[in-house]
Amino acid sequence: MDRSAEFGRWKAQSLSKADLSRKGSVDEDAVEVVELLNSREEFFTTSSCAGRILLLDGSTEGSGVQKQHCCWLLVTHKPCARDDVMAALKGATSEAVLKFEPFILHVQCRTLQDAQTLHSVAIDSGFRNSGITVGKRGKTMLAVRGTHGLEVPLTHKGKLMVTEEYIEFLLTIANQKMEENKRRIGRFYNYLQHALKRETISNSHSKIKERNNPLCTHKNRRSQGKAQGPSTTEDNGRELEDGDGLEISAALFLGDD
């Protein structure tokens, strides 16, 4: 199957699936970014979180939304107050941890070059832990990740180990990180718009130049004829694509689909 057609099939399948996240919808601060990417032929998003402050308990007992071996006592995508945390801590029976998790976004890209464009946008926006993964089946994934997280234990065996004053101090830091996270998402959206506009203009100019230059058109046709010969396979194309990525992007990983 043609690579572009296969990517289109993957995209249609992914976007038709129900949202299985706890919230069941895209976070408000990430909506514009997600909609912009999904409106383009070369991208689609597979998961996202705009950033959140949460309080997790290491026990699966008590109230809250349970996930794996911990209990979610509190989760918010907005700035958090001390009273909210203190009330939630009453449900802690084990090792309660206060966390801030920054924006994360997973995007499947049509080509490695598309992923590299998006990777540059992410790095320039402040998401320095972003990286590209190329799977064995040719799926190219870009993870947009930040490094400005926070994780602090508050209780041990259900007993509060810090003062309320310290919790208020931690929330001040977490809320500041939340605001900075929101600014970075805004930068990412703006930079992404400019990058996609440049790509569109560049592609348009290349097509016009090719149409107006008979010699260029003749050379391209000869190149295409060679590329379609029996010695060229899809696997060879992937190897060439992978090689380009290793030269250009340091954050490239090979893995399973």
UniProtKB/Swiss-Prot annotation:
**Keyword presence, Nucleotide-binding:** no
Set out the biological process GO terms recorded for this chain's protein: methylation; tRNA processing
Its domain of life reads Eukaryota
Which E.C. number(s) belong to this protein? 2.1.1.282
Q: Name one GO molecular function term.
A: methyltransferase activity
Q: Report the catalytic activity.
A: 4-demethyl-7-[(3S)-3-amino-3-carboxypropyl]wyosine(37) in tRNA(Phe) + S-adenosyl-L-methionine = 7-[(3S)-3-amino-3-carboxypropyl]wyosine(37) in tRNA(Phe) + S-adenosyl-L-homocysteine + H(+)
According to its UniProt record, in which pathway does this protein act?
Answer: tRNA modification; wybutosine-tRNA(Phe) biosynthesis
- What InterPro entries does the annotation carry? tRNA_yW-synthesising (IPR003827), tRNA_yW-synthesising-like_sf (IPR036602)
Which keywords does this chain's UniProt record carry?
A: Methyltransferase, Phosphoprotein, S-adenosyl-L-methionine, Transferase, tRNA processing
Q: Where is the composition biased (Polar residues)?
A: 225-234
- Gene3D superfamilies from the entry? tRNA wybutosine-synthesizing-like
**Residue numbers bearing the Phosphoserine modification:** S25
Signal sequence, start to end: none
Q: Where is this region: Disordered?
A: 202-244
Q: What does the protein in this record do?
A: Probable S-adenosyl-L-methionine-dependent methyltransferase that acts as a component of the wybutosine biosynthesis pathway. Wybutosine is a hyper modified guanosine with a tricyclic base found at the 3'-position adjacent to the anticodon of eukaryotic phenylalanine tRNA.
Q: Which family does it belong to?
A: Belongs to the TYW3 family.
| Protein name, per record | tRNA wybutosine-synthesizing protein 3 homolog
Q: What organism is this sequence from? A: Mus musculus (Mouse)
Biological classification of the source: Eukaryota, Metazoa, Chordata, Craniata, Vertebrata
User: Encoded by which gene?
Assistant: Tyw3
